[in-house]
UniProtKB/Swiss-Prot annotation:
It comes from Streptomyces griseus. It is found in: Cell membrane. This is Protein translocase subunit SecE. The lineage of its organism: Bacteria, Bacillati, Actinomycetota, Actinomycetes, Kitasatosporales. Component of the Sec protein translocase complex. Heterotrimer consisting of SecY, SecE and SecG subunits. The heterotrimers can form oligomers, although 1 heterotrimer is thought to be able to translocate proteins. Interacts with the ribosome. Interacts with SecDF, and other proteins may be involved. Interacts with SecA. The gene is secE. Gene3D superfamilies: Preprotein translocase secy subunit (1.20.5.1030).
Length: 95
């Protein structure tokens, strides 16, 4: 065991403050804002977050768009082939 000040075993003097001296904060500026104030805060936070975004360059955007379009076309082809195959199986089984 250590006898260091502020450790779990030996708390320092700041940790022993009486409960009556500690102030509990209720409300404050955040709790007193009306609906329009909260809405304005929401939009300010949106703008702040959008400023943090690292936007892709034009070449990256072209590459990403091409990859998505090719993937969608391949998936459309796969679903079409499966649909035609199932239709033929159902037609064969049920006449």
């Amino acid at each position: 065991m250590t006898d260091a000040v502020g450790s779990i075993d030996m708390p320092d003097a700041e940790d022993e403050a009486p409960e009556s001296k500690k102030k509990s904060r209720k409300g404050g500026k955040r709790g007193k804002k009306g609906p329009l104030g909260r809405l304005a805060l929401f939009y300010r936070q949106i703008v702040a977050e959008l400023r943090k975004v690292v936007w892709p360059t034009r070449s990256q955007l072209t590459t990403y768009t091409s990859v998505v379009i090719v993937f969608v076309v391949v998936m459309i082809g796969l679903v079409t082939v499966l649909d035609i195959g199932f239709a033929r199986v159902v037609k064969y089984v049920f006449g």
